[in-house]
């Protein structure tokens, strides 16, 4: 096929591929919104923060979300187009994810994939991999971060062949904007001098200079991460953080140490017992590693990861040695940041390794090109053929799964819309689900949204929320015991039960 030649792709060919990639992104976003039209929990927080921003309530904004830039964009976009904050967030996310797909192709080309075949392979990855599609129906800031992270990597790669100042400035600006979406962007911004040193020839740079940059970047990143850890609870301003950086890092280290010590104590008491208490640190370290591995493979998916490992095992690399060093450095930095998150929180949300996965995927077009060139189907043994077909079908299935996230929360939306006609005053609804409160128009009543059902029942028994006229509880479909417990605790049956074929159910109670 002419599309899959080794000839360099001209401007018209590249423009055609990028246009098809963008069109596919728009259609994919429309499809994902069609099959999942229920807002996500984070989306409620962003909308709540945007509403506080619109009223000039910065304290309420930061109470809703400590990283309000995306909410500010939703506010501006909504005002500009005259649409709701919900649709402003959805349109922004659709644009960001589509731009990420296009930028991914450009980054692969900047890393040496300039042929027609590699350009097509890059577009194929950007169109079908779940990392680009799985969260299109969500209102999240990660998509904005991913766009500007990829833009920074594009400028870094272009600095290799043309060390122009405009590319260096582009790296700084892109990382700075990425930092407005997620803390990782700020860490990469402070590490920019180190990353720029990686793309310089080792013959013109002293090892001690690179070591000095590493120490400085690590120190600045430690200050930023310490502020990120302490700011939500202590209300520390960024300027104040850098005015006393050593105290900030010391306080953060003390908090991390106390948190880890508590986790170790729990492991000793609940899992190991007195005769194996000395293995608590080993179990903790193993837990952190497994959290990292599980989150990374969950986002990258096993078949795609095996393709990358196969390529690395076969010696696949980028054409320029410096780009290999840059790629490895970016992956190492992502793993270091995720390790800090895992140690502090002992969990990683599924989308946290999103940028890491996209970085790893940069090698996939080159690995795919190598594998297809090396495989001789007629020479493969039966076992190898079966394995190849199995991995291919697995990879296709993983790709389809990113486009098959049909909502399981329609009962929540139905209940919220029904309650919207019955809970018109502030404090009239108590619920354990933010999405339900959003559709009922009561998401601004933060004190009336409690995720723990037991706390709601105890609060009702103690006379909390006296103005609430309705109680709406989302219960898992499998939690029959919890449902009977709720009915027994409230002393009566619900006035309405919202249920669908799949997903959770909602029990609505009317208070006397």
Predicted segments, located by residue:
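Extracytoplasmic catalytic/substrate-binding loops of multi-pass membrane glycan-assembly enzymes
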Residues: 34-48, 61-76, 83-84, 234-241, ...
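Short helix- or helix-capping micro-motifs
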Residues: 24, 121-130, 134, 154, ...
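Membrane-interface transmembrane helices that cradle and orient dolichyl/undecaprenyl
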Residues: 110-112, 152-168, 178
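Signature aromatic-anchored transmembrane alpha helix within multi-pass, membrane-resident enzymes
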Residues: 117-120, 173, 194, 215-220, ...
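Hydrophobic, aromatic-rich transmembrane alpha-helices
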Residues: 279-324, 334-335
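Transmembrane-helix motifs of polytopic, lipid-linked glycan transferases
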Residues: 91-112, 151
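Short acidic/glycine- and proline-prone juxtamembrane loop motifs at membrane-interface regions
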Residues: 41, 66-67, 137-144, 349
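Membrane-embedded, lumen/periplasm-facing catalytic core of multi-pass transferases
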Residues: 54, 108, 156, 387-438, ...
């Amino acid at each position: 096929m002419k599309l899959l030649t080794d000839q360099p792709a001209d401007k018209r060919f590249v423009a055609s591929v990028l246009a098809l990639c963008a069109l596919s992104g728009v259609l994919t976003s429309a499809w994902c919104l069609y099959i999942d039209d229920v807002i996500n929990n984070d989306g409620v927080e962003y909308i709540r923060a945007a509403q506080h921003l619109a009223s000039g309530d910065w304290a309420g904004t930061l109470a809703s979300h400590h990283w309000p830039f995306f909410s500010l964009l939703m506010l501006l976009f909504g005002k500009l187009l005259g649409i709701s904050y919900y649709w402003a967030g959805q349109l922004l996310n659709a644009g960001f994810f589509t731009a990420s797909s296009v930028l991914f192709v450009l980054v692969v080309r900047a890393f040496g994939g300039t042929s027609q075949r590699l350009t097509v392979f890059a577009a194929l990855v950007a169109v079908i991999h779940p990392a680009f599609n799985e969260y299109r129906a969500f209102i999240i800031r990660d998509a904005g971060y991913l766009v500007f992270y990829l833009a920074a990597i594009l400028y870094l790669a272009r600095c290799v062949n043309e060390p122009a100042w405009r590319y260096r400035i582009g790296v700084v600006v892109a990382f700075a904007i990425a930092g407005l979406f997620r803390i990782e962007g700020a860490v990469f911004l402070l590490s920019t001098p180190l990353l720029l040193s990686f793309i310089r020839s080792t013959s013109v740079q002293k090892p001690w200079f690179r070591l000095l940059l590493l120490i400085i970047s690590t120190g600045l990143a430690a200050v930023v991460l310490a502020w990120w850890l302490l700011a939500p609870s202590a209300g520390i301003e960024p300027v104040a953080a850098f005015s006393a950086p050593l105290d900030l890092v010391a306080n953060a280290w003390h908090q991390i140490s106390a948190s880890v010590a508590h986790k170790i104590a729990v492991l000793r008491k609940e899992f190991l017992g007195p005769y194996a208490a000395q293995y608590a640190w080993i179990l903790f370290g193993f837990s952190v590693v497994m959290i990292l591995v599980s989150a990374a493979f969950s986002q990258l998916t096993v078949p795609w990861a095996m393709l990358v490992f196969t390529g690395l095992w076969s010696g696949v690399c980028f054409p320029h040695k410096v780009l290999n060093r840059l790629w490895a450095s970016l992956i190492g930095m992502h793993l270091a940041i995720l390790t800090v998150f895992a140690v502090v929180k002992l969990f990683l949300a599924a989308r946290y390794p999103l940028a890491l996965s996209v970085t790893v995927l940069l090698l996939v077009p080159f690995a795919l090109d190598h594998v297809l060139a090396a495989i001789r189907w007629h020479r493969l043994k039966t076992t190898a053929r079966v394995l190849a077909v199995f991995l291919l079908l697995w990879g296709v299935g993983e790709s389809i799964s990113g486009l098959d996230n049909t909502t399981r929360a329609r009962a929540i939306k139905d209940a919220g819309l029904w309650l919207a006609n019955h809970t018109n005053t502030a404090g009239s609804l108590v619920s354990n689900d933010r999405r339900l409160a959003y559709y009922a128009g009561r998401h601004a009543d933060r004190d009336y949204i409690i995720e723990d059902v037991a706390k709601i029942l105890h609060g009702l028994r103690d006379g909390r929320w006296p103005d609430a006229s309705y109680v709406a509880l989302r219960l898992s479909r499998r939690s029959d015991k919890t449902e009977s417990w709720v009915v027994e605790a409230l002393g009566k049956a619900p006035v309405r039960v919202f249920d669908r074929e799949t997903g959770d159910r909602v029990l609505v109670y009317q208070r006397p």
